[in-house]
């Protein structure tokens, strides 16, 4: 992906996530993400023909636990940084049209 296209994709993603990025942040994040993608390209060059396929990196079995009630943050605390609140919950932009 070309750098210009990559920056446009980053802007779209930031907009969807309702992040307001400065041009400097856009440049910084685009560079960081490009470095990550470049690293993935390096990983694809590794010879893994002798590596057994696995579902998990660590051999963990029966990791599920019983649900338990624990202290958590209050609803007020959870919503304090929300850009918009409606009916004591997060208000998000509509992404689907209603059938009339």
UniProtKB/Swiss-Prot annotation:
Q: Per the UniProt entry, what is one GO biological process?
A: regulation of translational fidelity
* Entry function: Allows the formation of correctly charged Asn-tRNA(Asn) or Gln-tRNA(Gln) through the transamidation of misacylated Asp-tRNA(Asn) or Glu-tRNA(Gln) in organisms which lack either or both of asparaginyl-tRNA or glutaminyl-tRNA synthetases. The reaction takes place in the presence of glutamine and ATP through an activated phospho-Asp-tRNA(Asn) or phospho-Glu-tRNA(Gln).
EC number(s) on file: 6.3.5.-
This protein is called Aspartyl/glutamyl-tRNA(Asn/Gln) amidotransferase subunit C
Fetch the SUPFAM superfamilies from UniProt. Answer: Glu-tRNAGln amidotransferase C subunit
One family from Pfam that matches here is GatC
Recorded GO molecular functions are: asparaginyl-tRNA synthase (glutamine-hydrolyzing) activity; ATP binding; glutaminyl-tRNA synthase (glutamine-hydrolyzing) activity
**What is the protein's species of origin?**
Dictyoglomus thermophilum (strain ATCC 35947 / DSM 3960 / H-6-12)
Which InterPro entries does the UniProt entry name for this protein? Asp/Glu-ADT_sf_sub_c, GatC
């Amino acid at each position: 992906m070309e750098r210009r296209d990559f920056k446009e994709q980053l802007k779209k993603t930031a907009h969807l996530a309702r992040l307001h990025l400065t041009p400097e942040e856009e440049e910084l994040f685009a560079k960081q993400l490009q470095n990550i993608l470049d690293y993935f390209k390096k990983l694809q060059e590794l010879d893994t023909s002798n590596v057994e396929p696995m579902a998990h990196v660590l051999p963990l079995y029966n990791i599920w636990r019983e649900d338990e009630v624990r202290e958590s943050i209050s609803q007020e605390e959870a919503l304090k940084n929300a850009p918009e609140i409606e009916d004591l919950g997060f208000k998000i932009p509509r992404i689907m049209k209603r059938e009339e």
